[in-house]
Amino acid sequence: MIPENTGPAAVIVLAAGAGTRMKSRTPKILHEIGGRSMVGHALLAARSIEPRQLAIVVRHERDLVAGHVAELDPSAAIVDQDEVPGTGRAVEVALQALDAKEELTGTVVVTYGDVPLLSGGLLAELVATHEREANAVTVLTAVLDDATGYGRILRGEDGTVTGIREHKDSTDEERLIREVNSGIYAFDAAVLREALGKVTTDNAQGEKYLTDVLGLAREAGGRVAAVVTADRWQVEGANDRVQLAALGAELNRRTVEAWMRAGVTVVDPSTTWIDSSVTLDEDVRLLPNTQLHGSTSVARDAVVGPDTTLTDVEVGEGATVIRTHGSGSVIGPRAAVGPFTYLRPGTVLGEKGKIGAFYETKNVTIGRGSKLSHLGYAGDAEIGEDTNIGCGNITANYDGEKKHRTVIGSGVRTGSNTVFVAPVTVGDGAYSGAGAVIRKDVPAGALALSIAAQRNTEGWVPANRPGSRSAELAQAAINNSSSTPASTEEGK
């Protein structure tokens, strides 16, 4: 059971690292999993425990990180780490910045911008334990099958934490310890402030270590304890793209499982990817190789997939979306899309409407019950209700300099391969013939035709393409036709 939220004095998120192992021009903490940056996940977890103040410490690619954080959480304090290296110094500059507003009293939580699976529930448990036990420091730890490379948690006979030993400094006996330091802490603000003033850079790395605060707190008579989580993923960080992919896969597994438990059918969880920001109703059905991103929402009884990717798409109740790539679009209730359909931003398909195979749409509103069944393009257009757009229709919306709009009314029927040269309006109930090129407005109820009568020039191919296979076959057919005797009564 998750303890009641206690609202700490502050949360400090450390995000100043360079992340060189990512081998990327993008700052490490801006890399995404589940449709959200790692630091975005960290900020959400921090905000969920309702701290009175929130600070994030930045340094590497400072402007990029600060700008991103400001978009996600405008009220978060952005603090620059100075030239003194180390996690202890990062926390110290953040504490000084927060104290400048109002001296902190109570609990200060320290976490990281590259630990994306850390939940608000686990942070709340850390804070509740820290305050209930009146600890000076409470460290979040995890038990790993393979603790290689991690700092080991040292405990006294009474179970209290006596220290943290880095792997490289551990004895063979200490390396058998499976409980490791996550680097996530709850501190008493006064203890933290005093201890940081005593932490030095007198070590091999020349850094101010936050872990030194634990020993200083114990020396001052404070109690140091731990909250142990069996869920190692919540304290795993991503230092390279291999770890990032592993965290992304685990987050997606949890997300998919949570939706299934909430009433969503996922036929193949291993090939289904759902961003953290997606919303799904009960009785949604997701078929294999489906990806849902951004603010996508899917209403009850809708079927999405297989082989479908939707980003920021609203899918209405009972709709079907098959083998479709869509973004920034709305699919109405009981509408049908696909297969092999490309919905570009601004597409709005009305209730019971249809956009079929090999269709591309952009900035188009399609009314209730209207159908664009196959092989065409509709862009910068408005189509009314109960209209049928024939195969191969195109709205020619671009004149080389500007885009223009096509308006097609309700109850319209268009022939195959009709081209609408925008700007143009087609009135309600109008028809167009196959192959029509509509350059002028069509009145309501009119039939629009734009092609001349068919004319056949006999013998053109043999005369103009001599020596070609077509000419040979044509000449043979002509000769055969001319040599066939006319029917007579005797021949019957």
UniProtKB/Swiss-Prot annotation:
Its cofactor is Mg(2+). Signal peptide: none annotated. It holds the Pfam family NTP_transf_3. Residues 242-262 are annotated as: Linker. It is an enzyme of class 2 (transferase). One of its GO terms (cellular component) is cytoplasm. Residues 477-492 have a biased composition (Polar residues). HAMAP family: GlmU. NCBIfam families: glmU (TIGR01173), PRK14352.1 (NF010932). This is Bifunctional protein GlmU. The lineage of its organism: Bacteria, Bacillati, Actinomycetota, Actinomycetes, Micrococcales. The gene is glmU.
